[in-house]
């Protein structure tokens, strides 16, 4: 995966404000993920939060674009762009996460601690989910033959400081 640097995006202001309010509840990680997921539902961005160039993705791997980092480091908003066939490695996260699909379809596989497949789903435009460790081992795949998928992820950390959201890779 390749990352690009953050740029200010006024279109994200309602989402940033909503996530900030959700995080200020100081709930546990699972509850925070659900609160943030609700803010994503209420303030679902469009693909235009990314530049036309960013929306193209990369032939090498899915792309990550940091869109906002809260000044106190409590959360980051990231746009992920997946060309057809691109996927993540099986991984888990260092903190809570909420995400929404804003273009295309993302196929998600969920795994238990022994890496047994325990669930899978196709997430379409407008589908929103939130989760927190433990129990967040998954892989995401754009299974489309011809459509780029884009999703917005909110992580409970400053991803620019730590270099990403994954805690471990399993494959």
Label each residue range with its predicted role.
Residues 53-84, 128:
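A short glycine-rich, His/Asp/Glu-containing loop-to-beta-strand
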Residues 140-144:
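Asparagine-centered strand-capping/turn motif at beta-strand->loop junctions
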Residues 94-109:
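Glycine- and acidic-residue-biased ligand/ion/polar-headgroup-sensing regions
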Residues 1-48:
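N-terminal leader/capping segments at the start of a protein or of a new domain
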Residues 164-167:
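Mixed-charge, glycine-accented linear interaction segment located at domain edges/termini
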Residues 78-92, 133-134:
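Conserved short histidine dyad/triad with adjacent acidic residue
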Residues 113-138:
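Short acidic-glycine-tyrosine-enriched beta hairpin
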Residues 98-100, 146-162:
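A short hydrophobic beta-strand segment most commonly corresponding to one strand
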């Amino acid at each position: 995966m390749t990352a690009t640097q953050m740029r200010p995006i006024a279109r994200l202001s309602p989402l940033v404000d909503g996530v900030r309010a959700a995080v200020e509840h100081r709930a546990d990680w699972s509850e925070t993920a659900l609160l943030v997921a609700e803010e994503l539902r209420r303030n679902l961005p469009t693909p235009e939060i990314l530049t036309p160039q960013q929306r193209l993705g990369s032939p090498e791997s899915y792309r990550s674009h940091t869109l906002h980092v809260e000044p106190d480091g409590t959360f980051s908003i990231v746009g992920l762009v997946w060309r057809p066939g691109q996927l993540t490695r099986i991984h888990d996260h260092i903190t809570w996460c909420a995400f929404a699909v804003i273009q295309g379809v993302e196929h998600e596989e969920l795994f238990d601690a022994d890496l047994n497949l325990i669930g899978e789903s196709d997430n379409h435009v407008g589908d929103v989910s939130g989760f927190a460790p433990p129990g967040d081992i998954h892989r995401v795949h754009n299974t489309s033959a011809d459509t780029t998928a884009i999703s917005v992820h909110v992580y409970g950390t400053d991803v620019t400081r730590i270099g990403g959201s994954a805690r471990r890779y399993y494959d």
